[in-house]
Swiss-Prot record:
UniProtKB keywords: Endonuclease, Hydrolase, Nuclease, RNA-binding, tRNA processing
Protein name: Ribonuclease P protein component
NCBIfam families with a match to the protein in the record: rnpA
EC category name: hydrolase
Organism: Desulforamulus reducens (strain ATCC BAA-1160 / DSM 100696 / MI-1)
């Protein structure tokens, strides 16, 4: 099983935001940016507007687990950043999974065009 690696540095997040491709729906925004041989890395950004710390951490844990569970579906040597929108605060695991794949499909369509 491959290792789950998180983005930590602010400069890495800025590169993904500036040069990456994005897709969004009501609940999530997903950025994808190819990195040069650094492997598959994930970052999560959840604003304080989403809710209190308990809510934000629950959403981060849900997304992290979804990414870990479906690790083989994500491209190698790419950075992914998920931005959780305020409307996601009451979503459960299965709903977030559905929203994640919806955004993933939009991103793949956008890349093909």
């Amino acid at each position: 099983m491959k290792k789950f690696v998180s983005l930590k540095k602010n400069s890495d997040f800025r590169n993904v935001y500036r040069f990456g491709v994005s897709a969004a729906n009501r609940y999530l925004v997903l950025y994808k940016f190819p990195n040069k041989g650094l492997g598959r890395r994930f970052g999560f950004s959840i604003s304080k507007k989403v809710g209190k710390a308990v809510c934000r951490n629950r959403l981060r844990r849900i997304l992290k687990e979804l990414c870990r569970f479906h690790l083989d579906r994500f491209s190698d040597d790419c950075d992914f950043v998920f931005i959780v929108r305020q409307t996601s605060s009451d979503q459960d695991f299965h709903q977030m999974e559905k929203h994640m794949w919806h955004v993933w499909g939009k991103l793949n369509k956008q890349e093909k065009n």
